[in-house]
């Protein structure tokens, strides 16, 4: 739950807002989940899994960390992609520090270089090289660190392996240096500001990404139409519409005899029951909204709106 901002004065508490940014599949959501200690962002091997900014909250005594996990910076191919890219680049503004993730190998791509240019005009930033478990020669990692330091936009460069949870804890100390005295923006026991309905929608989309192939899952939007607790029981009724862009895609999402939809819904139900702490009656329907990713009205209707950082 988000707190009301009290009047200015002396506080024994402080907060640090952190934009977590990087190219697709560099490990932003995995790192956010690891640091938060809860699953606040869905994770798959497919690029552009994260579509909107996800907030993860960690409170350690008087210091509260607010991580803004952003969509991967990439060359957009539709209006949804442009909104995703803008969400990532806009997150540099109005945060206390940007944490930019990089792979340990390969040339920096065009989107990453645009991001570096934006950092020259923005606030402080640190670089984090993830996936160090893939590095065979330590000299290669040192070369990557030197390359990033030479860009002149990072206060420091850190190396981690999210997969092995190696050196990730050190990031808390690094980020704490940018904390600002003031109130905690969230309750101390909060770990995200995402409403339960949105968490449910994200879990269903995650399962579609995991179980379906190629481009089809990226053309899917999930909208929770009903979320209602049954009085006197531990059961929640959830009705969901899964939107796709083509009639042919609808058939693939449903699958032969409804097999694919049942598989997605069953896996999603298990996850939902775990984070909601109750039984879930999940009903899913598949509908077609042609080319919704290029329709401004539908993007707004499906919840893809620009979000303030605080």
Regions found by a protein language model. Give the residues of each.
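Catalytic P-loop NTPase motifs of RecA-like helicase/translocase cores
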Residues: 50, 73-75, 107-108, 135-136, ...
């Amino acid at each position: 739950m988000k707190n009301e901002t009290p009047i200015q004065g002396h506080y024994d508490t402080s907060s640090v807002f952190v934009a977590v940014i990087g190219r697709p599949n560099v490990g932003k959501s995995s790192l956010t989940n690891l640091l938060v200690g809860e699953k606040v962002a869905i994770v798959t091997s497919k690029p552009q899994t994260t579509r909107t900014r996800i907030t993860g909250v960690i409170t350690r005594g008087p210091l509260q960390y607010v991580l803004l996990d952003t969509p991967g910076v990439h060359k957009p191919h539709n209006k949804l992609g442009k909104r995703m890219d803008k969400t990532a680049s806009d997150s540099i503004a109005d945060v206390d520090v940007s944490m930019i993730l990089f792979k340990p190998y390969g040339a920096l791509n065009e989107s990453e270089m645009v991001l570096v240019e934006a950092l020259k005009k923005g606030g402080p930033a640190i670089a984090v090289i993830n996936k160090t478990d893939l590095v065979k020669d330590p000299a290669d990692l040192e070369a990557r660190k030197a390359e990033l330091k030479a860009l002149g936009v990072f206060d420091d460069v850190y190396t981690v392996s999210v997969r092995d949870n190696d050196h990730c804890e050190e990031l808390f100390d690094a980020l704490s240096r940018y904390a600002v005295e003031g109130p905690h923006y969230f309750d101390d026991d909060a770990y995200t500001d995402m409403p339960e309905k949105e968490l449910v929608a994200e879990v269903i989309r995650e399962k579609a990404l995991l179980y379906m192939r190629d481009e089809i899952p990226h053309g899917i939007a999930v909208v929770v139409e009903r979320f209602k607790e049954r009085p006197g029981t531990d059961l929640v009724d959830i009705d969901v519409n899964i939107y796709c862009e083509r009639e042919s895609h609808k058939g693939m999402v449903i699958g032969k005899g409804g097999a694919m939809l049942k598989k997605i819904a069953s896996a999603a139900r298990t996850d939902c029951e775990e984070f909601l702490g109750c039984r879930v009656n999940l009903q899913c329907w598949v509908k077609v909204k042609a080319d919704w990713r290029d329709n401004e009205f539908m993007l707004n209707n499906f919840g893809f709106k620009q979000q303030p950082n605080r």
